[in-house]
């Protein structure tokens, strides 16, 4: 699996860091305050991203539980599918799930471009919300991007030095029809 490293396996993976921690400090502090207050006012399921390039995924919601793998890509989107105190059960784009401590997750929204596609398919990053508009870049499957906004059909994303629009159903990290502001 290209974004998880099993314990005992040394795999070099490229990192893509799209935003600094200060950009999302306000979002993260709101999320942490809600959790600290014992109010899980956040919906489950929901998408979040990894804060670090080393995130231990455990069999259960405790440091006493064994580490089953390690995520090694900061910014990777994961889906929170359950909560237990300060632990979040997350699922990755390949469907694998496990438990992660809440402070290793960020409310910053990120996406993977067609992670289910195994071919050389390229997804256009359009200059506007139209398939007839000019493509500013072609994105490979598995490219990580930051979500700027989504309207339920299109998402405006930034990838490296490029910004543009991708059809929402070509992305993992946002729900079909979801609006993100």
Model-derived regions: residue spans:
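Bacterial N-terminal signal peptides that target proteins for export
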Residues: 1-9
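N-terminal processing/targeting junctions
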Residues: 8, 23-24
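Bacterial N-terminal signal peptides
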Residues: 8-16
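C-terminal segment of classical bacterial N-terminal signal peptides
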Residues: 15-23
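SH3-family beta-barrel domains
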Residues: 24-59, 70-74, 81-84, 91-93, ...
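Extracellular/periplasmic metallocenter environments
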Residues: 156
């Amino acid at each position: 699996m290209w974004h998880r490293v099993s314990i005992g396996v040394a795999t070099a993976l490229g990192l893509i860091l799209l935003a600094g921690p200060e950009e999302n400090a306000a979002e993260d502090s709101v999320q942490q305050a809600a959790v600290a207050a014992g109010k899980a006012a956040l919906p489950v399921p929901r998408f979040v991203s990894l804060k670090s390039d080393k995130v231990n995924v455990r069999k259960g919601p405790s440091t006493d539980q064994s580490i089953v793998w390690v995520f090694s890509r900061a910014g990777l989107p994961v889906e929170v599918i359950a909560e237990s105190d300060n632990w979040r059960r997350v699922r990755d784009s390949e469907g694998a799930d496990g438990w992660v401590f809440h402070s290793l997750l960020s409310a910053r929204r990120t996406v993977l471009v067609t992670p289910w596609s195994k071919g050389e398919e390229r997804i256009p990053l359009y200059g506007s919300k139209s398939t007839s508009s000019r493509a500013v870049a072609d994105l490979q499957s598995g490219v990580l991007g930051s979500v700027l906004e989504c309207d339920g059909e299109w998402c405006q994303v930034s990838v490296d030095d490029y910004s543009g629009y991708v059809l929402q159903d070509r992305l993992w990290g946002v729900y079909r029809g979801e609006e993100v502001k």
